[in-house]
């Protein structure tokens, strides 16, 4: 999956995968105990709260960009602490926002992102990959044992292989 490919046809698979990968994340975020929010994660610079903040931001970016707003329009409002007083509710809200823009028409569009132009399909596929990895980070940081969805992992492998091939 090259991020500069803007000719892909929209299909239901990437948004369905993204919604499926967000489900376990919602369950895991809901299970984080109060005393665990500052636990370390595999990302050296992020504790669980910062990691969940990152995911909330990604979901809100999807909503903003696929909803027609520009990076400049939303950059300030999507920086900083997005978890607020209730990170669990903030995650659930961000998930609903992301899901609300996953229509085939919006996925077929081309959007200006921080790295260049991408179709909605490419953008959602990128976010699917990020969320899948972050699910593992949440599990590790919170000590939860949740099995990865085999179909989602299988869907991620060719995307990862294409990315590796693209960078040489």
Each language-model region and where it sits:
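Structured surface interface patches that mediate subunit assembly and partner/cofactor docking
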Residues: 2-27, 31-44, 60-93, 97-168
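Extended, alpha-helix-rich binding/interface surfaces that flank or overlap catalytic cores
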Residues: 51
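Glycine-rich loop at the start of a catalytic domain that most often binds anionic cofactors/ligands
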Residues: 54-55
């Amino acid at each position: 999956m090259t991020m500069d490919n803007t000719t892909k046809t929209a299909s239901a698979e990437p948004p369905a995968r993204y919604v499926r990968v967000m489900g376990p994340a919602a369950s895991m975020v809901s299970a984080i105990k109060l005393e665990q929010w500052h636990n370390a994660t595999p990302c050296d610079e992020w504790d669980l709260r910062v990691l969940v903040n990152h995911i909330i931001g990604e979901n809100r970016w999807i909503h903003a960009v696929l909803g027609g707003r520009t990076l400049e329009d939303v950059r300030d409002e999507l920086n900083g602490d997005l978890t607020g007083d209730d990170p669990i509710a903030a995650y659930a809200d961000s998930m609903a926002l992301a899901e609300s823009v996953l229509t085939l028409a919006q996925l077929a569009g081309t959007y200006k992102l921080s790295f260049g132009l991408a179709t909605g399909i490419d953008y959602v596929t990128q976010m699917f990959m990020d969320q899948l990895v972050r699910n593992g980070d949440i599990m590790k940081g919170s000590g939860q044992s949740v099995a990865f969805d085999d179909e989602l992992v299988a869907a991620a492998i060719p995307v990862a292989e294409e990315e590796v091939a693209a960078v040489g």
